[in-house]
Amino acid sequence: MLENSLILGAYLFCLGIYGLTTSRNMIRALMCLELMLNGVNINLVAFSSFLDPDKIRGQVFAIFIIAIAAAEAAIGLAIILNIFRNRNSIRIDQFNLLKW
C-alpha cells in the first residue's frame, strides 16, 4: 500500500512539474502547482500512516496544506484576473508588469 501511494504521489508531483515548466498559460500553471501540492499531500499522508498509524499528525498537516492551497488559488486567480483586465492576455511570456 505504501509503494502505490508513493508512486501516485511522485507521479502527480512530476506531472505538475512538467506542466509548470511547459505551460504558457497562467491558469494552467496554477493548476499544475496545485497538482504538485496534492502529490506532496499524498506522500505525507502515506508516510504518516505507515510510520505511526495511531496518530493523525500527517493527516492534520495535509488538511492544513489543502487550506493554504485553497487560499493560494483564490489569490492567484484574483491576480490573474487583474492581469487579464489590464493586458487582455494571461500568457506567461507576455507577463512583464514588473519591468520599467
UniProtKB/Swiss-Prot annotation:
Transmembrane parts of this sequence: 1-21, 30-50, 60-80
Membrane-topology annotation of the record: Multi-pass membrane protein
Reaction(s) the record says it catalyses: a plastoquinone + NADH + (n+1) H(+)(in) = a plastoquinol + NAD(+) + n H(+)(out); a plastoquinone + NADPH + (n+1) H(+)(in) = a plastoquinol + NADP(+) + n H(+)(out)
InterPro entries: NADH_UbQ_OxRdtase_chain4L/K, NUOK/Mnh_C1-like
UniProt keyword annotations, A-Z: Chloroplast, Membrane, NAD, NADP, Plastid, Plastoquinone, Quinone, Thylakoid, Translocase, Transmembrane, Transmembrane helix, Transport
Family statement drawn from the similarity comment of this UniProt entry: Belongs to the complex I subunit 4L family.
HAMAP family named in the record: NDH1_NuoK (MF_01456)
Known function: NDH shuttles electrons from NAD(P)H:plastoquinone, via FMN and iron-sulfur (Fe-S) centers, to quinones in the photosynthetic chain and possibly in a chloroplast respiratory chain. The immediate electron acceptor for the enzyme in this species is believed to be plastoquinone. Couples the redox reaction to proton translocation, and thus conserves the redox energy in a proton gradient.
Subunit text: NDH is composed of at least 16 different subunits, 5 of which are encoded in the nucleus.
Annotated protein name in UniProt: NAD(P)H-quinone oxidoreductase subunit 4L, chloroplastic
Protein species of origin: Staurastrum punctulatum
